[in-house]
């Protein structure tokens, strides 16, 4: 077995399959593109689903990749086990209807055992297979595997409901008896017992059958196109090759761990658990790559996952004794480890560090709040005579504030408290179940559409034409190829002026005419077929026949509106880079007839000043009437030109570059104006957040922009009339004067309210009652607003008349309730929650002051009567 670095292992895998005629697919963003079923790219095949379901046919049916992936179902296990990670790399080879079982098994055995490649000892490799899959067993024997190393496993069958399925065969490496102290041997593998001796390194899925839950598995029909999907975990391979005790004891993690040693002053040893070292090393990899790919910490979805990872890493840093912020300082080390194949971390190092640093600073403030919560919880439990912390409270501290259970235990034990673990486990399982339920299971191989996949004719899009003579090559009705169609159908022509929806630009609409100039069909939509042809969805008026020539005409007015928005989108993207920063990467776009929508990564709301500057800059470029050039060239040449490639998009060798003067240059396959002046005008309508770290701008161009400006002008005129400003330029001064007058009136009103409260207070505060050892005042009062209640409470505080004050008032149709407390035994927030239901209300607050709102004034007498009972 050869000694290799992780970079060499990755490259050898790719080089091997390249030598076998495979195309190397570049690693895609961790943030899925156009796949709502996934929170993250979670496997090597996840980015290739379009090939397996037949929606796109690859240029080469043999593919290989090294794909970064994230899985966070069991974050708690990271650091506890030898091989659990949140971010990992999958190496894979894939066949889309090309080779199958025989070649896949032969490739695997050659790569692993040949002296030219990894050179693993054959006697160290064990293979599992599906018992009924005799073909796989026989093939392994044919390539040279010792039959005693072949282990049948009933679970070796890949299946997710109805659809493509098939047996799989897994390859394990035997690390020897040193990792099998009980000398259990092959039983560990045969009975699927968790162990550190037999390590799975490769899984080969043979997608062979069309699963149907209604029939026995043995009767599943075979798929028309059989596929191969394999996955090899890079971290596991490197661990075996480098002889690490765990995956963390390799060149993928050790440089990070060495930096953590410097920060903490503590020493990592593979012979001890060192959980905190492993957690930090794992989580900083995930954070660096995910943030580099455009995901940002937040309170939901991907953002919540990143926030949780960061907080967990910070807390483990504190367990190691690291003071202050430290996580961002590890990013350069992550970048250097991975730079040979993933240069993006170093390229975006400053931005990644900025985000992590800012988030860590925020969390450090949160930690202080969490510490106070723990202290407060322990004080309350002591006061109640309890000696244990309930599981629900532990989970709240863990889930909301990121406190590891171990840290809560330590703090509790220092104060003599026990921990109720069962409640924590129940709450944790409920959260995991919710997380799993939120992800729609998407199999690696979706349903195959044979009709569309079988179409292999050429179909060319004519960029410059609005009308074209075209021969009808293919007609599809109800998923069947036909020679003549009526009603709704799908058509493919040899050429077309109709743009198929792609890259955020909507499809063209229009009509199809016969030789006599009569309209025979309306084009409702255009999409790309699996082999890339332009597939026209039409509603026919008269029958259309395959082989005949028709005139295709697009709706030019619609196209004109769409291209204005598309070209403006390029200008907006460039302006965002200039004004907000280069981290503002496109996260989605839509170029419609009425408007354009642009989503981009950014960690804060775009300020009004920034939006104004973006709008000004885009319009300035429009008025310069810059030429919009399209250049067809090689991808390498385009990148040398500085063309911006959109992350997550897949580009072939030949690409189309759209260049707008010296202002913008992007890879783009869409249609555009000839000059920027054709856009006319650009106006931003809205800027908003649509998810964690993703902002959205909606804008309009041309006539729609003019209408938007006109609407704003009309609104301004209406406001001028309301404030009696003769000219629009005087509105600001008029409104400012009105605000000053309003403040003066409010001040006078507050003074009167204070006097009213003082006049009422003597009468209200006369009736001091007792409930046990607690004195209280409970009264219904007349006040204009909630502030009046607070004024009375302020007077009560100064006079020190009782321990508790309860005031209730009807304000309009609503009920307002105030509770104030000077007693350490009675918390206002708790008492207001008990009283509010009497008036159909709810509320809360601090231990000394709390308020609630309700809707049932009829419940006020009962509420006041209940105060003594609640305090007694």
Swiss-Prot record:
UniProt key word Nucleotide-binding: yes
GO biological process, one term: alanyl-tRNA aminoacylation
Coiled coil, from the record: none
InterPro entries: aa-tRNA-synth_II (IPR006195), aa-tRNA-synth_II/BPL/LPL (IPR045864), Ala-tRNA-lgiase_IIc (IPR002318), Ala-tRNA-ligase_IIc_anticod-bd (IPR018162), Ala-tRNA-synth_IIc_core (IPR018165), Ala-tRNA-synth_IIc_N (IPR018164), Ala-tRNA_ligase (IPR050058), Ala_tRNA_ligase_euk/bac (IPR023033)
Cofactor binding: number and manner: Binds 1 zinc ion per subunit.
Record bears the keyword Nucleotide-binding: yes
Binding site for Zn(2+): 566, 570, 668, 672
Pfam families found in the cross-reference section: DHHA1, tRNA-synt_2c, tRNA_SAD
Record's catalysed reaction(s): tRNA(Ala) + L-alanine + ATP = L-alanyl-tRNA(Ala) + AMP + diphosphate
Cofactor(s) needed: Zn(2+)
Keywords, alphabetical: Aminoacyl-tRNA synthetase, ATP-binding, Cytoplasm, Ligase, Metal-binding, Nucleotide-binding, Protein biosynthesis, RNA-binding, tRNA-binding, Zinc
E.C. no: 6.1.1.7
GO MF annotations in UniProt: alanine-tRNA ligase activity; aminoacyl-tRNA deacylase activity; ATP binding; catalytic activity, acting on a protein; transferase activity; tRNA binding; zinc ion binding
Family statement: Belongs to the class-II aminoacyl-tRNA synthetase family.
Domain comment as written in the entry: Consists of three domains; the N-terminal catalytic domain, the editing domain and the C-terminal C-Ala domain. The editing domain removes incorrectly charged amino acids, while the C-Ala domain, along with tRNA(Ala), serves as a bridge to cooperatively bring together the editing and aminoacylation centers thus stimulating deacylation of misacylated tRNAs.
Function recorded in the entry: Catalyzes the attachment of alanine to tRNA(Ala) in a two-step reaction: alanine is first activated by ATP to form Ala-AMP and then transferred to the acceptor end of tRNA(Ala). Also edits incorrectly charged Ser-tRNA(Ala) and Gly-tRNA(Ala) via its editing domain.
Protein name: Alanine--tRNA ligase
Native source organism of the sequence: Lactococcus lactis subsp. cremoris (strain MG1363)
GN (gene name): alaS
């Amino acid at each position: 077995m050869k000694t290799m670095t992780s970079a060499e292992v990755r490259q050898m895998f790719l080089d091997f399959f390249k030598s076998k005629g495979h195309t190397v697919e570049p690693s895609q963003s961790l943030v899925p593109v156009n796949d709502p079923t996934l929170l993250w790219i979670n496997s090597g095949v996840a980015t290739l689903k379009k090939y397996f379901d037949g929606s796109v046919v690859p240029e080469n049916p043999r593919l290989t990749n090294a794909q970064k992936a994230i899985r966070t179902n069991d974050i708690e296990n990271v650091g506890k086990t030898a091989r659990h990670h949140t971010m990992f790399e999958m190496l894979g080879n894939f066949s889309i209807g090309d080779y199958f079982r025989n070649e896949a098994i032969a490739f695997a055995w050659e790569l692993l055992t040949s002296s030219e490649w990894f050179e693993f000892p054959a006697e160290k490799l064990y293979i599992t297979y599906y018992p009924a899959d005799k073909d796989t067993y026989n093939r392994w024997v044919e390539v040279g595997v010792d039959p005693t190393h072949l282990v049948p496993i009933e679970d070796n069958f890949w299946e997710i409901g109805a659809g493509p399925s098939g047996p799989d065969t897994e390859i394990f490496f035997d690390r020897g008896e040193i990792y099998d102290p009980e000398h259990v041997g092959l039983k560990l593998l045969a009975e699927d017992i968790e162990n550190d001796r037999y390590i799975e390194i490769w899984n080969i899925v043979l997608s062979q059958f069309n699963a149907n839950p209604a029939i026995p598995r043995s009767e599943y029909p075979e798929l028309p196109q059989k596929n191969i999907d394999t996955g090899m975990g890079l971290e596991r391979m490197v661990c075996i090759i480098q002889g690490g005790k765990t995956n963390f004891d390799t060149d993928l993690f050790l440089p990070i761990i060495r930096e953590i040693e410097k920060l903490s002053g503590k020493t990592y040893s593979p012979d001890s658990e060192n959980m905190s070292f492993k957690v930090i090393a794992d989580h900083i990899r995930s954070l660096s790559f995910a943030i580099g790919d455009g995901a940002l910490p937040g309170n939901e979805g991907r953002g919540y996952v990143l926030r949780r990872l960061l907080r967990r890493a910070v807390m483990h840093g504190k367990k190691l004794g690291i003071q202050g912020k430290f996580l961002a300082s590890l990013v350069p080390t992550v970048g250097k480890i991975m730079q040979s194949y993933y240069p993006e971390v170093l390229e975006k190092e400053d931005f990644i560090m900025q985000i992590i640093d800012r988030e860590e600073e925020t969390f450090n403030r949160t930690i202080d709040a969490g510490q106070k919560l723990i202290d407060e919880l322990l004080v309350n439990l002591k006061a109640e005579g309890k000696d244990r912390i309930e599981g629900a409270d532990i989970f709240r501290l863990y889930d909301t504030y990121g406190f590891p259970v171990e840290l809560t235990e330590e703090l509790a034990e220092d104060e003599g408290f026990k921990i109720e673990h069962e409640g924590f486990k129940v709450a944790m399982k409920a959260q995991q179940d919710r997380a799993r339920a939120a992800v729609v299971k998407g199999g690696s191989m979706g349903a195959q559409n044979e009709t569309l996949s079988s179409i292999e004719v050429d179909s060319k899009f004519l960029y410059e034409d609005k009308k074209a003579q075209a021969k009808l090559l293919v007609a599809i009705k109800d998923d069947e190829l036909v020679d003549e169609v009526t009603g709704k159908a799908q058509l493919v022509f040899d050429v077309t002026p109709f743009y198929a929806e792609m890259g955020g630009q909507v499809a063209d609409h229009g009509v199809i005419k016969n030789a006599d100039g009569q309209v025979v069909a309306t084009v409702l939509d255009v999409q790309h077929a699996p082999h890339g042809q332009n597939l026209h969805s039409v509603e026919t008026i008269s029958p259309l026949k395959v082989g005949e020539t028709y005139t295709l005409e697009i709706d030019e007015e619609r196209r004109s509106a769409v291209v204005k928005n598309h070209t403006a989108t390029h200008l907006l993207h460039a302006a965002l880079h200039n004004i907000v920063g280069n981290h503002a990467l496109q996260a989605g776009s839509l170029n419609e007839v009425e408007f354009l929508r642009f989503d981009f990564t950014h960690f804060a709301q775009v300020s009004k000043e920034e939006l104004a500057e973006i709008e000004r800059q885009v319009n300035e470029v429009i008025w310069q009437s810059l030429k919009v050039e399209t250049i067809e060239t090689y991808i390498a040449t385009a990148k040398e030109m500085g063309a911006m490639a959109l992350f997550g998009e897949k580009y072939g060798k030949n690409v189309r570059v759209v260049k707008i003067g010296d202002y913008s240059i992007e890879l783009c396959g869409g249609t555009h104006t000839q000059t920027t002046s054709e856009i006319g005008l650009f106006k931003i309508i809205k800027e908003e957040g649509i998810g964690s770290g993703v902002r959205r701008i909606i804008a309009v161009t041309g006539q729609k922009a003019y209408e938007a400006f006109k609407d704003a002008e009309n609104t301004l005129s209406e406001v001028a009339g309301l404030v009696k400003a003769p000219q629009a330029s005087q509105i600001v001064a008029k409104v400012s004067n009105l605000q000053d007058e309003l403040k003066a009136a409010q001040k006078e009103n507050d003074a009167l309210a204070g006097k009213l409260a003082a006049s009422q207070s003597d009468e209200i505060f006369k009736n001091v009652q007792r409930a046990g050892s607690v004195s209280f005042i409970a009264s219904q009062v007349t006040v204009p607003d909630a502030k009046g209640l607070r004024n009375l409470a302020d007077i009560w505080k100064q006079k020190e008349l009782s321990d508790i004050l309860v005031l209730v008032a009807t304000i309009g149709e609503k009920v307002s309730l105030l509770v104030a407390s000077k007693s350490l035994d009675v918390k206002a927030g708790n008492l207001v929650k008990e009283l509010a239901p009497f008036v159909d209300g709810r509320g809360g607050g601090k231990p000394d002051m709390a308020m609630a709102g309700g809707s049932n004034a009829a419940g006020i007498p009962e509420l006041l009567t209940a105060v003594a009972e609640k305090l007694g």
